[in-house]
């Protein structure tokens, strides 16, 4: 039986983006780093859990640093130079993720804290008794 002719397609070139935004969601259990363009379309993302850390090691500053490095290197294919950073959450990976993006060669133009603060909304969880 003859093989069907395969259609040759060229790989589409990645679009070039000069300025972007980095969204860092630092919870107590994990850190999610998403790098987007100016319109908010995701270019790359990485998490502490997806970077090989499991359990309580996900919530360490080093895990957040590794996640930010992975997201930063994946976004370099788009030609990003400048980043505006938005940090959300009280987690331990806030500062180290920003430092890792800076060390990856990005010029950080602005850092904004967008942590949602309730105006006396839902009742918070009870305090832990260890």
From Swiss-Prot:
GO terms for cellular component: ribonucleoprotein complex; ribosome. Keywords: Ribonucleoprotein, Ribosomal protein, RNA-binding, rRNA-binding. GO terms for molecular function: rRNA binding; structural constituent of ribosome. Transmembrane segments: none annotated. Pfam families: Ribosomal_S11 (PF00411). Part of the 30S ribosomal subunit. Interacts with proteins S7 and S18. Binds to IF-3. HAMAP family: Ribosomal_uS11. NCBIfam families: PRK05309.1, uS11_bact. PANTHER family: 40S RIBOSOMAL PROTEIN S14/30S RIBOSOMAL PROTEIN S11. This is Small ribosomal subunit protein uS11. It comes from Pseudoalteromonas atlantica (strain T6c / ATCC BAA-1087). The gene is rpsK.
